[in-house]
C-alpha cells in the first residue's frame, strides 16, 4: 500500500459521504503498514498495528468503508460478522477460522499475482498448443515428429490468432479434468472438510478430457493451465503466509452483538466466550492453517458496531485494551442524504438513470426533487427506526416502482422527477406512521 493517507481518504470520498474521522483513522492505519515495512528488521518486529474500533449507528458507512478498503488494500483482507462465531465447545465456527480464511484469501491473491507475472510465457505456450491442434506436426512411421517446412505457415496462423481472426473457429482440445470431492461434515468442522478434500484430490491421478470450444475460449483455458504449471506451490505457500503475517487486515463487523448485556446469563456466556477467544488472536498468537503456521502479531484488526443497546465499555476490558483507536461515526442528516444521492461515483440516482436508459427511458432528477427525497427518508428515519442511508434505497424503490414496471412500454419518453412528483408518490406513506413502518 504505497498510497498516502490523503490519497486513501480521497479515494474513499468518491464513494462515502462524510465520516472524515473514520476515513482518516483507516488511512493512517493502512499507511503505517507500508511505513513499518521500511524499518530495519529488528525494529519492524517491535512495531505492532494500532487496531481500530469504529462506533456508529446503522447505515452511516461502517460496512461501506470495509468494502472500499478491500478494493484499495493490495493485501489479504477479510470481512467477517462477529455473530457467526461461537466459543470453543459450542456448535458453530471458531474464531481461529478467521485466520484460516484470511490465509486462503492470501493464497488466492499470491497465486493470481504469480499467474500474471508468468502470463506472457503462458500465452506463448498456449498459442503453441492451439497451433499444434490447427497444424498437427508431421510424424514419421515410428511416430517421431519430423522437422517440416511449415514454419512460415505456423507464423501466419500465429499472427491470425493474435489478431483475433480465428476467435470463432471451434477446435477440440485436451483440458485438465477438475476432480470434485463432496464431503459432508457437521457445522464448525470446515477446516477438516477442506483438508480431506485436498487429500482426496491429491490422490486422484491427473486426468484430461476432450472439450470442444471456440478458440478464444480455449486460449483462456490454456493460458490458465500453462501459468499454473509455471508456479511453484511451496514457494506460493511461503509468500501467502508472509503476506498474511505482514500485511493481513481483518474487519470484524457487529462486534457489539457479542457484548454481555446487563446481568443476563445463558446465551451471553457464549458471547463472552467469543470475546475471550478473540483476545489471543488480536494480541498475537499462532494459528495452524492448511498452508502452514500463521503468526497474528502484525495483522491489523478493525472492529465496528452500532452499540445501540450495548456500549463499548461492555466489551471485556482486555479486548478494549487491544482496540486503542476509537472512532465515532456521526448520524446522517438531510444534507448528507442529498450528497449521497448525487456525489458518489455510482450514486443511487445515477444507477436508476442508467438502468432506465437500457429501456430507452430518460430519467432526470431535479435539485428540488432530490431534496424532497432526502427529506422524506430523513423524516421516516426520525419517526420509525433510524437505519441511516439504507432508508434511501427503500424510499427510491417506492418512488420508482411505477416507472420500473412500465419502462418497457415507455421507450423514448423523458420523465422529470421533481418535488411535485416525489410528493405525489410518497406523501401518503411518509405522513402515515403506520404505513411508513411497514412499507418504508
Curated annotation (Swiss-Prot):
Domain of life: Bacteria
Subcellular location: Cytoplasm
GO process terms (BP): protein unfolding; proteolysis involved in protein catabolic process
Key word Cytoplasm present: yes
CDD domains: RecA-like_HslU (cd19498)
Family annotation (Gene3D superfamilies): 1.10.8.60, DNA helicase RuvA subunit, C-terminal domain, P-loop containing nucleotide triphosphate hydrolases
Any one of the GO CC terms: HslUV protease complex
Residues bound to ATP: 17, 59-64, 253, 318, 390
SMART domains the record matches: AAA, ClpB_D2-small
UniProt cross-references to InterPro entries, sorted A to Z: AAA+_ATPase (IPR003593), ATP-dep_Clp_protease_ClpX (IPR050052), ATPase_AAA_core (IPR003959), Clp_ATPase_C (IPR019489), HslU (IPR004491), P-loop_NTPase (IPR027417)
Signal sequence annotation: none
NCBIfam families: hslU, PRK05201.1
Subunit-structure text: A double ring-shaped homohexamer of HslV is capped on each side by a ring-shaped HslU homohexamer. The assembly of the HslU/HslV complex is dependent on binding of ATP.
Function: ATPase subunit of a proteasome-like degradation complex; this subunit has chaperone activity. The binding of ATP and its subsequent hydrolysis by HslU are essential for unfolding of protein substrates subsequently hydrolyzed by HslV. HslU recognizes the N-terminal part of its protein substrates and unfolds these before they are guided to HslV for hydrolysis.
HAMAP family from the UniProt entry: HslU
UniProt name for this protein: ATP-dependent protease ATPase subunit HslU
Species this protein is from: Glaesserella parasuis serovar 5 (strain SH0165) (Haemophilus parasuis)
Amino acid at each position: 500500500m504505497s498510497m498516502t493517507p490523503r490519497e486513501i481518504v480521497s479515494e474513499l470520498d468518491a464513494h462515502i459521504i462524510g465520516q472524515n474521522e473514520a476515513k482518516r483513522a483507516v488511512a493512517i492505519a493502512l499507511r503505517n503498514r507500508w511505513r513499518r515495512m521500511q524499518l530495519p528488521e529488528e525494529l519492524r518486529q517491535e512495531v505492532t498495528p494500532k487496531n481500530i474500533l469504529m462506533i456508529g449507528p446503522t447505515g452511516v458507512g461502517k460496512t461501506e468503508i470495509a468494502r472500499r478498503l478491500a478494493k484499495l488494500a493490495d493485501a489479504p483482507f477479510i470481512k467477517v460478522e462477529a455473530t457467526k462465531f461461537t466459543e470453543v465447545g459450542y456448535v458453530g465456527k471458531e474464531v481461529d477460522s478467521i485466520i484460516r480464511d484470511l490465509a486462503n484469501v492470501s493464497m488466492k491473491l499470491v497465486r493470481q499475482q504469480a499467474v500474471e507475472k508468468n502470463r506472457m510465457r503462458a500465452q506463448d505456450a498456449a498459442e503453441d498448443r492451439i497451433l499444434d491442434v490447427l497444424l498437427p506436426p508431421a510424424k514419421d512411421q515410428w511416430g517421431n515428429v519430423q522437422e517440416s517446412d511449415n514454419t512460415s505457415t505456423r507464423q501466419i496462423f500465429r499472427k491470425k490468432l493474435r489478431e483475433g481472426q480465428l476467435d470463432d473457429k471451434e477446435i477440440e482440445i485436451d483440458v485438465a479434468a477438475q476432480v470434485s470431492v463432496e464431503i459432508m461434515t457437521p457445522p464448525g468442522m470446515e477446516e477438516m472438510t477442506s483438508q480431506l478434500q485436498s487429500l482426496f484430490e491429491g490422490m486422484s491421478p491427473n486426468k484430461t478430457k476432450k472439450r470442444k470450444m471456440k478458440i478464444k475460449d480455449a486460449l483462456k483455458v490454456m493460458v490458465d493451465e500453462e501459468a499454473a504449471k509455471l508456479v511453484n506451490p511451496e514457494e506460493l505457500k511461503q509468500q501467502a503466509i508472509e503476506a498474511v503475517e505482514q500485511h493481513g487486515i481483518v474487519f470484524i463487523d457487529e462486534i457489539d452483538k457479542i457484548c454481555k448485556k446487563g446481568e443476563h446469563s445463558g446465551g451471553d456466556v457464549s458471547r463472552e466466550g467469543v470475546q475471550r477467544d478473540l483476545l489471543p488472536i488480536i494480541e498475537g498468537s499462532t494459528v495452524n492453517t492448511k498452508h502452514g503456521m500463521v503468526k497474528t502479531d502484525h495483522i491489523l484488526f478493525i472492529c465496528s458496531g452500532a452499540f445501540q443497546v450495548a456500549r463499548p465499555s461492555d466489551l471485556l476490558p482486555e479486548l478494549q485494551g487491544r482496540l486503542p483507536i476509537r472512532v465515532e461515526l456521526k448520524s446522517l442528516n438531510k444534507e448528507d442524504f442529498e450528497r449521497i444521492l448525487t456525489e458518489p461515483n455510482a450514486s443511487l440516482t445515477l444507477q436508476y438513470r442508467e438502468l432506465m436508459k437500457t429501456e430507452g427511458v430518460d430519467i432526470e432528477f431535479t435539485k428540488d426533487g432530490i431534496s424532497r427525497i432526502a427529506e422524506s427518508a430523513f423524516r421516516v428515519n426520525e419517526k420509525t427506526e433510524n437505519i441511516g442511508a439504507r432508508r434511501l434505497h427503500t424510499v427510491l424503490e417506492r418512488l420508482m416502482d411505477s416507472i420500473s414496471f412500465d419502462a418497457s412500454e415507455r421507450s423514448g419518453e423523458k420523465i422529470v422527477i421533481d418535488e411535485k412528483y416525489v410528493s405525489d408518490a410518497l406523501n401518503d406513506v411518509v405522513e402515515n406512521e403506520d404505513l411508513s413502518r411497514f412499507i418504508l
